[in-house]
Amino acid sequence: MRFTPAIVIAAFCSLAVAAPAAKAIARSPSEAVEDYVIPIDKKRGEAVEDYVIPIDKKRGEAVEDYVIPIDKRGEAVEDYVIPIDKRGEAVEDYVIPIDKKRGEAVEDYVIPIDKRGEAVEDYVIPIDRKRGEAVEDYVIPIDKRGEAVEDYVIPIDKRGEAVEDYVIPIDK
């Protein structure tokens, strides 16, 4: 991927404006964090993210709207750069090798099959012989309440709601 100056500047700006986020989190729980951690430019009264994408003054368009190269057909290059073969199909639709003997896409059977006739991926997760369980079923730490830690590490606020349930901004 080629980094144009516009992309580098936009990335830098987004990093620079994210710095005040830690201070902003201490605000009212009635506001979603996302609603106020994006810095507001006081002169313009706009969220910084609304204008940090460089604007091409000649065209009046956000650079991201046209940095995907446009070819002479007036199409975005990304719309057709997946090579099209003579059959009129995108190469990606059939480049997964086909095993001519089986008539199957190789990806359907390249997962090694063991002598039990099972795909290796079905049982390579280590099995704890004492418990007879796949290790992944219990490596998430269990606390004294008998609950998986992942079930409650999302912070719960005073309303009894998981924080993640309400930090997504709601349009008022």
Curated annotation (Swiss-Prot):
<feature type="propeptide">
    <location>
        <position position="172"/>
    </location>
</feature>
<protein>
    <recommendedName>
        <fullName>Ribosomally synthesized cyclic peptide phomopsin precursor phomA</fullName>
    </recommendedName>
</protein>
<feature type="propeptide">
    <location>
        <begin position="129"/>
        <end position="137"/>
    </location>
</feature>
<feature type="propeptide">
    <location>
        <begin position="57"/>
        <end position="65"/>
    </location>
</feature>
<feature type="propeptide">
    <location>
        <begin position="158"/>
        <end position="165"/>
    </location>
</feature>
<feature type="propeptide">
    <location>
        <begin position="86"/>
        <end position="93"/>
    </location>
</feature>
<keyword id="KW-0732">Signal</keyword>
<feature type="signal peptide">
    <location>
        <begin position="1"/>
        <end position="18"/>
    </location>
</feature>
<feature type="propeptide">
    <location>
        <begin position="42"/>
        <end position="50"/>
    </location>
</feature>
<comment type="function">
    <text>Ribosomally synthesized cyclic peptide phomopsin precursor; part of the gene cluster that mediates the biosynthesis of the phomopsins, a group of hexapeptide mycotoxins which infects lupins and causes lupinosis disease in livestock. The phomA translated product contains a 10-fold repeated peptide embedding the hexapeptide Tyr-Val-Ile-Pro-Ile-Asp, that is converted into phomapsins. After being excised from the precursor peptide by kexin proteases, the core peptides are cyclized and modified post-translationally by enzymes encoded within the corresponding gene cluster.</text>
</comment>
<keyword id="KW-0843">Virulence</keyword>
<feature type="propeptide">
    <location>
        <begin position="100"/>
        <end position="108"/>
    </location>
</feature>
<feature type="propeptide">
    <location>
        <begin position="144"/>
        <end position="151"/>
    </location>
</feature>
<comment type="pathway">
    <text>Mycotoxin biosynthesis.</text>
</comment>
<feature type="propeptide">
    <location>
        <begin position="19"/>
        <end position="35"/>
    </location>
</feature>
<feature type="propeptide">
    <location>
        <begin position="72"/>
        <end position="79"/>
    </location>
</feature>
<keyword id="KW-0677">Repeat</keyword>
<feature type="propeptide">
    <location>
        <begin position="115"/>
        <end position="122"/>
    </location>
</feature>
